[in-house]
UniProtKB/Swiss-Prot annotation:
Reaction equation(s) it catalyzes: L-glutamate 5-semialdehyde + phosphate + NADP(+) = L-glutamyl 5-phosphate + NADPH + H(+)
Species of origin: Histophilus somni (strain 129Pt)
Protein name in the entry: Gamma-glutamyl phosphate reductase
Lineage, uppermost ranks: Bacteria, Pseudomonadati, Pseudomonadota, Gammaproteobacteria, Pasteurellales
Its biological purpose: Catalyzes the NADPH-dependent reduction of L-glutamate 5-phosphate into L-glutamate 5-semialdehyde and phosphate. The product spontaneously undergoes cyclization to form 1-pyrroline-5-carboxylate.
Enzyme Commission no: 1.2.1.41
C-alpha cells in the first residue's frame, strides 16, 4: 500500500470536487444512499464476519454494539445521507465582506479544506458519515478504520466508490487504508504534503498518539466523560427520566452520562428513587463512600469508586455516583475529571443554571436536558464527522461548516495600492 500515491490521488480528486456544483454533489449522495439500501444484504454479510471475529476475540458487548449493522441501521445511515442532501451547501457562501476605501470589493468566501484524514475505531457507520459529509463540502477523504471493522469498511467504501463512478466523479475522492499495520497510521500523520486535517475518532490513547506524532493539524475530541449534576431544587421525577436517557439509551456513545453528581442535601431522598427507576436497566454503580452507604441499603449492585474510574469513559452501563456539597463543588469536580465534551445541570434555579453554563468548560452545556443531544443530527447539522472538544477551528459536533475554511477574494478594476 503506497500512502504517498493515495495522498496524491486524493489531492487530485479534491481539485475536481472543489469545482462541483451543489446539484452534482447531491446527485452523487443520492446514489450513495440508494446503493447502501440496495446492497444492504452484501453489507450485512461482511459485517457478520466482523461480528464473528469480535466475539472470538472476546470483545465487550459495548464494542460489539458499535460494530453491529442491521437492516434498520443501514436504512438509518442512508437516511442520514439524504438529510445531508437537504442541507444548504456551505461552499461558495459569502461569509462577510464589503467595499474598501480603494473601491475594491472584498469578500470572505467559504471553501473546502482539501484532503481530510480520518482515523477511527469500531464504528462502521462513521465510514459513511464521514465520506458523505466530506463529499458535500468538496473535500476528499482518506479513511482508516479500526481492524475490528475491516470487512464492513471495505464493502462500504466499495459501495461509495462505485456510486461515485456512476456519476462520473473520481473514486479516489473516498479512499481507505485497509492494512491494519499501525505504521500506516503513523505514515498518514506525516503526509502533510497532501493531507490538510487529521480527525481521530476513538479513545484517549488514539487522540494522544495523533497529537504526539502528527505534522498535520489534528482535531481533538470524542472522548466523553460526561456529567449530570442534580441540584437540590431539581424536579426529581423529571430528573430521573433525564438520567435514564443519558445513561441507558445507548451506553456506548461518547455523549453518554458517566458520572452522576448529586447534591448532598437531597442524596438520601434521591438515590433510592434512582435505584428504583433503573432497577431493570442492569446499571452497575461505582460510588463514593457517602453514596455507597445509601446505595447498599437499596440492594443495588455497587462498589467503591476508584479515582481512575472518575476519568474513565465506561461505554457501558457502569455509572459513577459522587455526592457534592454544592454547585461550586460540582463544577470543581467537572473541571478536574471532565473531558470538555457534554455537561448537564438539573435545576429549577435560573441563577444556578446561568452560573453552571458560565463556568463549566465544555463543548456542549445542558440545562434540564440529556447529554445525549450532543450529536450532529440532533443539532440539525446532519451526520457529524466528529465531536470536537478543543476550542480552535471547530467545537462540538462537526457538521458541514466545520469541514470548510475560507479565502479572501478581492475584486478591483486594475486597482493598485496607494
Amino acid at each position: 500500500m503506497n500512502l504517498k500515491e493515495m495522498g496524491k490521488n486524493a489531492k487530485q480528486a479534491a481539485t475536481i470536487l472543489a469545482q462541483l456544483s451543489q446539484q452534482q454533489k447531491n446527485t452523487a449522495l443520492q446514489i450513495i444512499a440508494e446503493q447502501l439500501e440496495l446492497q444492504s444484504n452484501k453489507i450485512l454479510v461482511e459485517n457478520a464476519k466482523d461480528i464473528q471475529l469480535a466475539k472470538e476475540n472476546g470483545l465487550s458487548d459495548a464494542i460489539i454494539d458499535r460494530l453491529l449493522l442491521t437492516k434498520e441501521r443501514i436504512n438509518s445511515i442512508a437516511n442520514d445521507v439524504r438529510h445531508i442532501i437537504s442541507l444548504p451547501d456551505p461552499i461558495g457562501q459569502i461569509i462577510d465582506g464589503g467595499i474598501l476605501e480603494s473601491g475594491t470589493k472584498l469578500e470572505r468566501v467559504r471553501v473546502p479544506l482539501g484532503v481530510i484524514g480520518v482515523i477511527y475505531e469500531a464504528r462502521p457507520n462513521v465510514t459513511v458519515d464521514v465520506a458523505t459529509l466530506c463529499l458535500k463540502t468538496g473535500n476528499a477523504v482518506i479513511l482508516r478504520g479500526g481492524k475490528e471493522t475491516s470487512y464492513s469498511n471495505k464493502i462500504l467504501v466499495t459501495v461509495i466508490q462505485d456510486a461515485l463512478e456512476q456519476t462520473g466523479l473520481p473514486k479516489n475522492a473516498v479512499q481507505a487504508i485497509t492494512d491494519p499495520d499501525r505504521n500506516f497510521v503513523l505514515e498518514l500523520l506525516k503526509l502533510d504534503k497532501y493531507v490538510d486535517m487529521i480527525i481521530p475518532r476513538g479513545g484517549a490513547g488514539l487522540h494522544e498518539f495523533c497529537k504526539q506524532n502528527s505534522t498535520i493539524p489534528v482535531i481533538i475530541g470524542g472522548v466523553g466523560v460526561c456529567h449530570v449534576f442534580v441540584e437540590e431544587s431539581a424536579e426529581q421525577d423529571k430528573a430521573l427520566a433525564v438520567i435514564d436517557n443519558a445513561k441507558t439509551q445507548r451506553p456506548s456513545t461518547c455523549n453518554t452520562l458517566e458520572t452522576l453528581l448529586v447534591q448532598e442535601s437531597i442524596a438520601t431522598e434521591f438515590l433510592p428513587k434512582l435505584v428504583a427507576h433503573l432497577k431493570h436497566k442492569n446499571v452497575k454503580y461505582h460510588a463514593d463512600p457517602t453514596a455507597l452507604s445509601i446505595l447498599e441499603k437499596q440492594n443495588a449492585e455497587v462498589s467503591i469508586v476508584q479515582e481512575q474510574q472518575l476519568r474513565q469513559e465506561w461505554g457501558s452501563l457502569d455509572l459513577n455516583v459522587v455526592i457534592v456539597k454544592d454547585i461550586q463543588q460540582a463544577i470543581a469536580h467537572i473541571t478536574e475529571y471532565g473531558t470538555q465534551h457534554s455537561e448537564a445541570i438539573l435545576t429549577s434555579s435560573p441563577r444556578l443554571a446561568h452560573q453552571f453554563v458560565s463556568l463549566v468548560d465544555a463543548a456542549a452545556v445542558y440545562v434540564n436536558a440529556s447529554t445525549r443531544f450532543t450529536d450532529g443530527g440532533q443539532f440539525g447539522l446532519g451526520a457529524e464527522v466528529a465531536v470536537s472538544t478543543q476550542k480552535l477551528h471547530a467545537r462540538g459536533p462537526m457538521g458541514l461548516e466545520a469541514l470548510t475554511t475560507y479565502k479572501w477574494v478581492c475584486s478591483g478594476d486594475y486597482t493598485v495600492r496607494q
